[in-house]
Structure formats: structure tokens, C-alpha cells
Amino acid sequence: SKYCFCGSMDLKDYYDLMFWNQDDHYLVHVGSNKGKLALTNEFEETKLDLKDDMKKIEFTDKLKNKDISKQYDNPDWKTKGSDKCLSCAACTTLCPTCYCHEIKDEVTLTDLKKGDRLREWSSCQLKSFTRVAGDHVFRDARTDRFKHRIFHQLQYFKERYNVEMCVGCGRCITHCPTEIDFVQIINEFEDKKKK
């Protein structure tokens, strides 16, 4: 994908197989024993000269600085990102690591002692996601929701688990109907900072 920035993320220890599309075939790098097992069961080993293929792999280290901690109050989040955002949740629906959900209780009206507690997939980009009793919404402004997703992917998760949540696949950018490229936005912040 032209929007892939996986080279910017700390993925060296966190994959089974990495695929690079080379038009009529794929280059595959094995990253774990599970990945090796998957290949030995499904494919025959071949010996190829990959020098030309390796030159074709697009450089994917596109994010200039993952430390966005000092950018939270930057007013450009609104003008460059959230003003264009439709809150459609395409970014979070297609993200392989987003896991936001809501809990709902369904009570059986014929027997009030029975019911189900359900976890439904949701999105932090939806205004209703942070709505609580009393109709209070914690992230009412679209800018707050927009920033929250990016900070959760690159900052908050890393602070807690010491690894970025984002894998850099670029699906959120590729499928955004208004073509919001948060990597480009962060890089512009970085360029401004250097001036």
C-alpha cells in the first residue's frame, strides 16, 4: 500500500509472516516459528535471486517522529484533520488493532431473572461511544475523538505496554473517504518544529 508506514513502527518482533507484493508474486519474511510452520505446510521452498525484488520494496519508514506527546494541544489537528473527518468510523473498522466496544444488557421480558450481557464492537470515532448516564458525552467534539484515536495508537498504548498499538498498515489512510493522512499531519508538525 502506498500509505503503509510499517517501517516506522517497532514490528521486528511482532509478526509471523511479512508479505511484500511484487506484482506477480510475494516476498515473504518469516518472523516466528508459527510463520515458518505455516510456510512449510503450504509452500514448497524455492531458490530465487531476490536482489532485484528487494530493490522494489517501497521504503516504508515514513513517520518522522512517533513521539507526539507534545502535540496534543496543537491547533492544526482541527484544521488539517478533524475538520475533514466525517466520524464515519472507516478508520477504526478497518484497523487490525482497534478493539473499542460497548457493553449492553438484554433482559428477557418473559423472565426478568434471565438476560444476556453482550459486547458489541464500536468505535471511539462515534459521538455515542463516550455517552454515559445523564447524557454526558466525554469526547463531544470531533477534534477530541480524532486526536484520541491517534494518541491511543501511538502514545497511550505505548505508555502502558511499551509498544505502539499501530502496526503502520495504512488501512485507515487508504480507506478514509476524505483522505485524511495522519502520518502526513504528524510529519508536518515535525517539520514546523524544526523551523
Please identify what each model-predicted range represents.
Residues 1-74:
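Iron-sulfur-associated redox domains of electron-transfer enzymes in respiratory
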Residues 1-3, 94-96, 137-139:
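N-terminal start-of-chain detector that recognizes signal peptides
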Residues 5-7, 86, 96, 125, ...:
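Secreted/luminal cysteine- and crosslink-motif detector
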Residues 35, 81-82, 90:
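Small-side-chain structural scaffolding
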Residues 65-83, 101-175, 179-195:
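Ferredoxin-type iron-sulfur electron-transfer modules in oxidoreductases and energy-metabolism complexes
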Residues 88-89, 169:
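A short, glycine-centered helix-capping/turn motif at helix boundaries
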Residues 89-106:
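Internal helical hairpin/lid segments
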